[in-house]
UniProtKB/Swiss-Prot annotation:
<comment type="function">
    <text>Not yet known.</text>
</comment>
<keyword id="KW-0244">Early protein</keyword>
<dbReference type="Pfam" id="PF05248">
    <property type="entry name" value="Adeno_E3A"/>
</dbReference>
<dbReference type="InterPro" id="IPR007912">
    <property type="entry name" value="Adeno_E3A"/>
</dbReference>
<protein>
    <recommendedName>
        <fullName>Probable early E3 12.1 kDa glycoprotein</fullName>
    </recommendedName>
</protein>
<comment type="similarity">
    <text>Belongs to the adenoviridae E3A-2 family.</text>
</comment>
<feature type="glycosylation site" description="N-linked (GlcNAc...) asparagine; by host">
    <location>
        <position position="77"/>
    </location>
</feature>
<keyword id="KW-0325">Glycoprotein</keyword>
Length: 106
């Protein structure tokens, strides 16, 4: 199975048991599994990475202001990477749970 196929299968498995209100597996995020060689600065390692598309958040603010104001926050893309340095490369189920926990901090 290719890394892309393994990542999709892991995402679906995580989705089946995750009970979080927000879950990376339900959202439209790019989810990949990777392996890094010993020559890589973070290697040898393996892990998962998600990329969350940015967006604009707008809200009307009336409290503590003489006039109603519109507050707009424009956020770019966010990338979350989890690196595992164990001796058994593979897409561990715990990596999906960790990336979901980090996703919920965003």
């Amino acid at each position: 199975m290719s890394n892309g196929g393994a990542a999709e299968l892991a995402r679906l498995r995580h989705l089946d048991h995750c009970r979080r209100f927000r879950c990376f597996a339900r959202e439209l995020t790019e989810f990949i599994y990777f392996e890094l060689s010993e020559e890589h600065p973070q290697g040898p390692a393996h892990g998962v990475r998600i990329t969350i598309e940015g967006g604009i958040d707008s809200r009307l603010h009336r409290i503590f202001s003489q006039r109603p104001v519109l507050i707009e926050r424009d956020q770019g893309n966010t990338t979350i990477s989890i690196y595992c340095i164990c001796n058994h490369p593979g897409l561990h189920e715990s990596l999906c749970c960790l990336v979901c926990a980090e996703f919920n901090k965003n």
